[in-house]
Amino acid sequence: MKSKQEIVPNVTIAIPVYNVERYVEKALLSALEQDFQLPYEILVIDDCGNDNSMEIVRKLQSEHPQGNIIRIIRHERNKGLGEARNTSIREARGKYLLFLDSDDWLNKEALSILYKAAIEHDAEITIGSTLKVYEGSDKTETFVYPETFISKPSAGIELNVFRGITPLVSYWNKLFLLDFIKKSDMYCVHRIMEDVIPDFKAKVLSHKVVTIPDITLYYNERGGSIMDTLWVNDTKCQQTIDTTVDIIKRIKRMIQEDYYNIDGIYDIYFANLMRYFFLYEQLGVTQEQYPQVMEIEQNCMSFIPSLRYIHGRNARIMYLLLHRREHDRSDFFKAYRFASSRLGRMLKLLISL
């Protein structure tokens, strides 16, 4: 008879830890106190911070009644969230893998809800709904998805482009079949915006995707998080620009080499472009940084063969507005600002009537 330690877990919850002593206890307790009745493990990735985060983890490991399901993997040096995700993929023992960031927390029934849906549909990706909590205020925001099951090639594109269900670009709050992640080579390649390339591959390569309306994750929107510090100084701004340029190059190359004939692929590409144009607006890109930004601007619209390759009505309008101005740098950003403005949204509404 196998001992408890030898039992293969059904699910691995992976939690990266780096300088989160204010938050990690709540995150870890939410993982420890799941009502899930099958074996699962909690994999903590110690990314070599300099606060008391890991002391809190080790205390829970030794004192909590469920503490023996915690397993700690320590990096030899700080490697960033992307590599912490990769370590989780390599080290996970569960059939399914759920990422939990160390400043968020799970609904007590999250594993039960996600696992049940995954098993019922033999899904590669099972996506729960999210409640975003704004730290220090009563403000909340919900991201609730209808109950949906898609079984077809590139199921993630079908979900996003043709069903209009657009889960957040993230690894968290999604229960993944671990074999699917490995076979699809969904490893992170960047320190920031690390989930974008794996998310792109997930959309393209998935065959069975489930979304459920139940809130399974509480996402903590806090000051000082990685996303909030992307543009705090010139160095961070430059790092962000470098990363976005590389992401777009990688996505273009994957489309050109392997995915050019997939219906809806250019919608996914275009959505990423729009995300980065918005980011550049937030960054306040300087004249010195424009040459790199132009690597995305230059010919970015012409990479899309024609308007008929874009399916969403709003995306088609944005494409038309930007395509006419792509060779004029100043007009290009003016067009983006206009298309994103309230006036632009009003025009979209009028056109849709």
Regions found by a protein language model. Give the residues of each.
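Short aromatic/hydrophobic "clamp" motif used to bind/position activated sugar donors
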Residues: 97
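Donor-binding/catalytic cores of nucleotide-activated saccharide
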Residues: 102-212, 219-236
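Glycine-rich, basic loop-to-helix element that forms the pyrophosphate-binding segment
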Residues: 75-92, 113
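Membrane-interface aromatic/basic loop that binds lipid-linked glycans or pyrophosphate carriers
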Residues: 281-353
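Short beta-strand/loop segment that forms part of the nucleotide-sugar
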Residues: 39-48, 71-75, 102
